[in-house]
């Protein structure tokens, strides 16, 4: 077996990457806590609300320490916002919109969490420990499109490759700086030798000519690509600096992209076959511990711990335990009938959640690869669709599913308020401006608005400094024997790493507290 075929057959598993030294183990993430059993030898009971990643991780780690855990999950699946949509997936949104996914076998999109940063070591630790194979997620592609809808001048209503945009703006910026240096306006700060070194850097950074002018180079691509014989290739002409300044292309949506975000620096990863491979791996470790279709109705403190009332087979059922770890999103928690402290209830009421939505579009052929040479990555626009994501799996296949929009805030709210057919229509009409192939190749769609997904009602917690100072501390301390977990109790909101690290924090705190009991 060749090295290439081995990678393809394993999906570039974590073990493979580690064996070749491309990824290193993270021993700091090993969780080694001392056992703190009861003096009577019985396991301490813990009820965990929610089978998202925070709840699953809590049950998994406490289970290893000998606790008797029960996880109550309102849905028939685990994962929470780690949700892979594939053929047969069904969802009824708040408001009654129902849909069933019609994707062909092997096609999917991740409706929630969709990428793993290389620097989220705890997430990678659990993928390693649970045996979840990973592959590359291509989040940055210079061949993807930018499209400026509206504006003025030569670039109004025009799409361009990201590489053209980056090359032109780096070139013109470097040209302006090089000219300023040549005018000796910085002599007081820099020596002559310093100026020469900086100009050399700018000439390389902006790919300037000998006259320190930017005229466009092969960095931005070709009109006609190079070929054999007497075919050197024809360079594409750059757009003018004034064209950029007069257009809408100077908006943050175009230049403030993931390339500048710490968590989105390459390399990014994804589980082979869908992000739900992670919660499914936890499920295998927690066999018999998760009760599905069990929405929680009440949470009460008792003299000896907690009492939880939940629905099972249409009937109210009661469960008591020594401790409760509540891993419900705050929009769900605030509707729960409970005797949580006023501070916790106030935090749940006032900490906002992101409105966000996605749509998966299945096409007959992968025209973005065949026609546009786009293999993974993200196109961006100032329209309501905001982003188009291209799949990093199934390359060179026949059919494909791309994410036709991924939007936030008021745009996500407006699009989410549309009927399902209206969301699809908007995605196709606006996406057509980047990909004219849409009408001919489209087959079906599946959309979701997280603010309308039952048992979530939002994408992730959104903090500003004031909200963080005023409400966040109440989420971090136990309320009697009730602990809170979830990305909303971390500074890693919106990431799976937030769920993981919150669970670890709660397990440590609860276990240390039990240790104090044991000593008495």
Listing of model-derived features with the role each one plays in the protein:
Residues 1-14:
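N-terminal secretory signal peptides and thylakoid transit peptides that target proteins
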Residues 37-40, 101-108, 253-267, 284, ...:
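Short glycine/proline-rich turn/loop motifs
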Residues 292-403:
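Mid-domain catalytic core of redox enzymes
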């Amino acid at each position: 077996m060749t090295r290439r075929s081995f990678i393809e057959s394993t999906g570039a598993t974590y073990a493979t990457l580690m064996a070749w030294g491309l990824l290193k183990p993270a021993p700091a993430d090993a969780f080694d806590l001392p056992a703190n059993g009861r003096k009577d030898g019985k396991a301490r009971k813990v009820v965990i609300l929610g089978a998202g990643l925070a709840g699953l991780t809590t049950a998994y780690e406490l289970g290893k320490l000998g606790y008797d855990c029960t996880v109550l999950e309102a849905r028939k699946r685990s994962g929470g916002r780690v949700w892979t949509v594939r053929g047969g997936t069904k969802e009824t949104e708040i408001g009654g919109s129902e849909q069933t996914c019609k994707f062909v076998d092997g096609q999917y999109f991740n409706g929630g969490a969709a990428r793993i940063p290389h620097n989220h070591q705890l997430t990678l630790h659990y993928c390693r420990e649970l045996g979840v194979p990973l592959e590359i997620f291509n989040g940055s592609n210079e061949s993807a499109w930018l499209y400026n809808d509206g504006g003025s001048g030569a670039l109004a209503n025009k799409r361009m490759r990201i590489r053209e945009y980056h090359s032109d703006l780096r070139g013109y910026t470097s040209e302006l700086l090089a000219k300023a240096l040549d005018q000796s306006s910085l002599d007081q700060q820099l020596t002559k030798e310093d100026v020469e070194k900086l100009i050399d850097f700018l000439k390389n950074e902006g790919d300037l000519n000998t006259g320190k002018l930017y005229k466009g180079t092969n960095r931005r691509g070709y009109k006609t690509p190079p070929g054999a014989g007497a075919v050197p290739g024809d360079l594409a002409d750059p757009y003018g600096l004034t064209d950029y300044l007069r257009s809408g292309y100077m908006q943050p949506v175009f230049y403030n992209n993931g390339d500048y975000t710490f968590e989105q620096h390459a390399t990014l990863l994804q589980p082979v076959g869908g992000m739900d491979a992670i919660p499914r791996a936890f499920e295998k470790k927690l066999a018999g511990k998760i009760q599905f279709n069990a929405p929680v109705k009440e949470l009460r403190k008792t003299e000896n711990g907690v009492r939880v009332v939940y629905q099972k087979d249409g009937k109210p059922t009661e469960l008591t335990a020594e401790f409760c770890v509540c891993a419900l999103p705050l929009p769900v928690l605030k509707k729960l009938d409970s005797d949580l402290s006023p501070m916790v209830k106030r935090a749940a009421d006032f900490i906002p959640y992101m409105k966000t939505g996605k749509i998966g579009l299945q096409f007959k052929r992968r025209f973005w690869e065949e026609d546009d040479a786009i293999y993974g990555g993200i196109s961006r626009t100032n329209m309501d669709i905001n982003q188009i994501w291209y799949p990093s799996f199934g390359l060179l296949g026949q059919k494909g599913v791309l994410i036709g929009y991924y939007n936030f805030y008021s745009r996500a709210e407006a699009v989410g308020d549309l009927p399902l057919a209206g969301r699809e229509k908007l995605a196709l009409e606006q996406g057509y401006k980047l990909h004219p192939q849409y009408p001919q190749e489209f087959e079906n769609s599946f959309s979701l608005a997280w603010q309308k997904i039952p048992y979530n009602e939002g994408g992730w917690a959104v903090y500003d400094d004031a909200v963080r100072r005023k409400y966040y501390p109440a989420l971090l301390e136990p309320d009697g024997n009730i602990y809170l977990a979830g990305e909303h109790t971390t500074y890693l909101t919106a990431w799976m790493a937030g769920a993981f690290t919150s669970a670890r924090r709660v397990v440590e705190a609860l276990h240390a507290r039990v240790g104090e009991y044991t000593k008495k």
